[in-house]
Amino acid sequence: MASTPKANVPKIDVSPLFGDNMEEKMKVARAIDAASRDTGFFYAVNHGVDVKRLSNKTREFHFSITDEEKWDLAIRAYNKEHQDQIRAGYYLSIPEKKAVESFCYLNPNFKPDHPLIQSKTPTHEVNVWPDEKKHPGFREFAEQYYWDVFGLSSALLRGYALALGKEEDFFSRHFKKEDALSSVVLIRYPYLNPIPPAAIKTAEDGTKLSFEWHEDVSLITVLYQSDVANLQVEMPQGYLDIEADDNAYLVNCGSYMAHITNNYYPAPIHRVKWVNEERQSLPFFVNLGFNDTVQPWDPSKEDGKTDQRPISYGDYLQNGLVSLINKNGQT
């Protein structure tokens, strides 16, 4: 059987985005622009985050947490006693049906006294954590990682803004530590033996899948993953394989970026192939604040006019997450 063609996913040195040299930053911006209008994906290298420590700490957590602890942390979709946990918490595997499992946490600044927590604003939750004695240092590491990847994402948003001909802070002014709705998801795909048939989905083209086609619900997505190729992106000629790189972050636009740019930077349709190997997928979904709204425009037009209507990020996120679950099922 012939192998699937590889997608063009360039490696972009994003380190200039942390500096002051505008000429170098514009080189990065042009590379981001080209990638965003091709396959929609690029690898960010020289990003400044210790991804090996991230991988090791996540593996240690996944292999030490017990079933009882997972249940105690489970989101409402799995544990009905946890009515306030819609996003943050543990997403369980289901024997004979779903092998993947994950732990999701939100902005560490969402404490009980946060105004948006106090007002019970949708999509805002206080994080839940495993017992510190059983998982010493995990919470401290996870919260620090949130801010590390937040900093990288802020730099990437500066690059996207420049790529679109805007001021550097065009996106980052809406991406604030006090109220960003971004999430870290620590996903584990286990090796299975035996393999329950229900764990494998089959696409219309016959490809075996772990997760069906979708667009990301985000402004952009910043993903670290194991060195196990599993993602495919849809292109006019069909689905193409995305090569893995466990030293870099895979970056792509979400559907909010597609909406506000009139699809100038589309959200690439992608899917997860079935690969029976132990691996990690650790996305950071870059989300703005609940009340933030970016006015849509069309970068391809001189006057920028578009018929796209503005939508607040909170409304977008709520509707997008529900639609994704309705389409592909609870993750």
From Swiss-Prot:
SUPFAM superfamilies: Clavaminate synthase-like (SSF51197). It comes from the Eukaryota. The record marks F211 as: Transition state stabilizer. Fe(2+) binds at H214, D216, H270. N-[(5S)-5-amino-5-carboxypentanoyl]-L-cysteinyl-D-valine binds at R87, Y91, S183, Y189, H214, D216, S281. Coiled coil: none annotated. It holds the Pfam family DIOX_N. Induction: Expression is repressed by glucose. The transcription factor rfx1 controls penicillin biosynthesis through the regulation of the acvA, ipnA and aatA transcription. Expression is also controlled by the transcription factor pacC that specifically recognizes the 5'-GCCARG-3' sequence in the promoter. The gene is ipnA. Isopenicillin N synthase; part of the gene cluster that mediates the biosynthesis of penicillin, the world's most important antibiotic. IpnA catalyzes the cyclization of the tripeptide N-[(5S)-5-amino-5-carboxypentanoyl]-L-cysteinyl-D-valine (LLD-ACV or ACV) to form isopenicillin N (IPN) that contains the beta-lactam nucleus. The penicillin biosynthesis occurs via 3 enzymatic steps, the first corresponding to the production of the tripeptide N-[(5S)-5-amino-5-carboxypentanoyl]-L-cysteinyl-D-valine (LLD-ACV or ACV) by the NRPS acvA. The keyword Metal-binding applies. One of its GO terms (molecular function) is iron ion binding. GO terms for biological process: penicillin biosynthetic process. Residues 176-288 form the Fe2OG dioxygenase domain. Its cofactor is Fe(2+). Isopenicillin N binds at R87, Y91, S183, Y189, S281. Binds 1 Fe(2+) ion per subunit. This is Isopenicillin N synthase. It comes from Penicillium chrysogenum. It catalyses: N-[(5S)-5-amino-5-carboxypentanoyl]-L-cysteinyl-D-valine + O2 = isopenicillin N + 2 H2O. Its EC number is 1.21.3.1. 2-oxoglutarate binds at R279. GO terms for cellular component: cytosol. Belongs to the iron/ascorbate-dependent oxidoreductase family. Pathway: Antibiotic biosynthesis; penicillin G biosynthesis; penicillin G from L-alpha-aminoadipate and L-cysteine and L-valine: step 2/3. Monomer. It is found in: Cytoplasm, Cytosol.
